[in-house]
């Protein structure tokens, strides 16, 4: 195997050449084959891959909640019951994805490194708008793969330190970015989740209320969309729920979400019509 440091034990020139503070730009110069969208040229559309499904985000005074179901599907089969589709992006933001699971996970990892790399190089963090724009550029880079069936779209949310508010950004496969002021959902169950959120959202939601309606929206999506997984009480698999406020990012523990799920199931048992 060739020595990556070379005969003299030095790093290759690409590592020493001044460039931008973007890790994705550096990767495109030094190892472009490692970028998520670099593997185009497939013989045809790809279908037999796992897909992540429904993510929701809800803004409330003082922050934002993001929640995702745990199911990944492959065709008509359940590929995984405990997949995690909501992730920490940096100290004041989170990101989730819907679509091809492998590409989505790779995109999230690259985005996390991108934000960390910028902070280390520049000694400061990107603004929330700049983070959203960096993510849009990565989504655009995956367009060739998306056109061959390996599509993934993220949902990005965070706490804006400049305005003191939680903000939500959604994307399409061509990287068009939209800011949602109240709530948003992506994935196969999003139409049902949005309908649920539309009925329950209020501008004065508390953090606990925002968690409740987010989990309830996923419950409603799972009720009508077979690709969205509902809470699995037997296996103790509950939605991944994260909050971002002025105190930063925090993921809720399962034992915090369990009573929320229990309360929803109890309420639904007395109102079987939903």
Swiss-Prot record:
The formation of the proteasomal ATPase ARC-20S proteasome complex, likely via the docking of the C-termini of ARC into the intersubunit pockets in the alpha-rings, may trigger opening of the gate for substrate entry. Interconversion between the open-gate and close-gate conformations leads to a dynamic regulation of the 20S proteasome proteolysis activity. GO terms for biological process: modification-dependent protein catabolic process; proteasomal protein catabolic process. One of its GO terms (molecular function) is threonine-type endopeptidase activity. The active site is at 53 (nucleophile). The keyword Ribonucleoprotein does not apply. It catalyses: Cleavage of peptide bonds with very broad specificity. Its EC number is 3.4.25.1. It is found in: Cytoplasm. Signal peptide: none annotated. Its main location: cytoplasm. The 20S proteasome core is composed of 14 alpha and 14 beta subunits that assemble into four stacked heptameric rings, resulting in a barrel-shaped structure. The two inner rings, each composed of seven catalytic beta subunits, are sandwiched by two outer rings, each composed of seven alpha subunits. The catalytic chamber with the active sites is on the inside of the barrel. Has a gated structure, the ends of the cylinder being occluded by the N-termini of the alpha-subunits. Is capped by the proteasome-associated ATPase, ARC. Belongs to the peptidase T1B family. Component of the proteasome core, a large protease complex with broad specificity involved in protein degradation. This is Proteasome subunit beta. It comes from Frankia casuarinae (strain DSM 45818 / CECT 9043 / HFP020203 / CcI3).
């Amino acid at each position: 195997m060739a020595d990556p440091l070379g005969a003299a034990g030095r790093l290759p020139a690409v590592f020493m050449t001044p460039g931008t503070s973007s890790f994705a730009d550096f990767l495109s110069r030094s190892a472009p084959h490692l970028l998520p969208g670099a593997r185009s040229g497939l013989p045809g559309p790809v279908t037999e891959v796992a897909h992540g499904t429904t993510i929701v985000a809800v803004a409330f005074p003082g922050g934002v909640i993001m929640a995702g179901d745990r199911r990944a599907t492959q065709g008509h089969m359940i590929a995984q019951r405990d997949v995690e589709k909501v992730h920490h992006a940096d100290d004041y933001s989170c990101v989730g994805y819907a679509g091809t699971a492998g590409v989505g996970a790779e995109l999230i990892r690259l985005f996390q490194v991108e934000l960390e790399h910028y902070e280390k190089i520049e000694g400061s963090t990107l603004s929330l708008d700049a983070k959203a724009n960096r993510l849009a550029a990565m989504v655009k880079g995956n367009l060739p793969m998306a056109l061959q069936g390996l599509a993934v779209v993220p949902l990005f949310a965070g706490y804006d330190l400049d305005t003191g508010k939680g903000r939500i950004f959604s994307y399409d496969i061509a990287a068009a970015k939209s800011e949602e002021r109240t709530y948003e959902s992506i994935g196969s169950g999003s139409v049902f989740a949005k309908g649920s959120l539309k009925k329950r959202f209020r501008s004065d939601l508390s953090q606990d209320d925002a968690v409740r309606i987010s989990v309830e929206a996923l419950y409603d999506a799972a009720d009508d969309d077979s690709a969205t997984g509902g809470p699995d009480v037997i296996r103790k698999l509950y939605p991944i729920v994260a909050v971002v406020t002025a105190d930063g990012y925090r993921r809720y523990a399962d034992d915090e979400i369990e009573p929320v799920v229990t309360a929803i199931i109890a309420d639904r048992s007395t109102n079987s019509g939903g």
